[in-house]
């Protein structure tokens, strides 16, 4: 199993990136919390990884820190929560927002994440109650965009943001509406976070 990946960042097409490690290109799915912390293209990158082996595919998920990976692993242990849904949760809610929603049994907030219905939200609360507070929080804080990685939000970058939102389960219409909350001149990583916050509003 691959637990850590160190190499050169070749491509960024949220939520997937391509990392060259020893001449091999690894396709890695990352949550937006990690995407926002990535360096620029052709820069060194280190990710903590989780490998999921299925009959039809071997999937690699990457995270900026161990604690974020541990939270992902806690999520996928819950019945009905797979890798894609866990990424959507980590992308749509900050760790403190997720912990607060679980502690307050806030089904409404959890259900705003695409793919999370009432029953899944109830299972999340039941399984995670009392567990999130024990996670290290140092590398789960809201990340700032990586230095040198800023890109202006123009047509291509807006397409990347829309693609990322749709990969998380939002519809094209929802993604387009969320883009209206992203000011011109905002870098892509921040644009994704702003769009997700807009989608999380009641």
Curated annotation (Swiss-Prot):
Domain I: region residues: 1-64
Main subcellular location of this protein, as a coarse class: cytoplasm
Keyword DNA-binding: yes
One of the GO BP terms on file: DNA repair
Keywords: Cytoplasm, DNA damage, DNA recombination, DNA repair, DNA-binding
Gene3D superfamilies in alphabetical order: 5' to 3' exonuclease, C-terminal subdomain, DNA helicase RuvA subunit, C-terminal domain, Nucleic acid-binding proteins
Assembly mode: Homotetramer. Forms an RuvA(8)-RuvB(12)-Holliday junction (HJ) complex. HJ DNA is sandwiched between 2 RuvA tetramers; dsDNA enters through RuvA and exits via RuvB. An RuvB hexamer assembles on each DNA strand where it exits the tetramer. Each RuvB hexamer is contacted by two RuvA subunits (via domain III) on 2 adjacent RuvB subunits; this complex drives branch migration. In the full resolvosome a probable DNA-RuvA(4)-RuvB(12)-RuvC(2) complex forms which resolves the HJ.
Family: Belongs to the RuvA family.
Full protein name: Holliday junction branch migration complex subunit RuvA
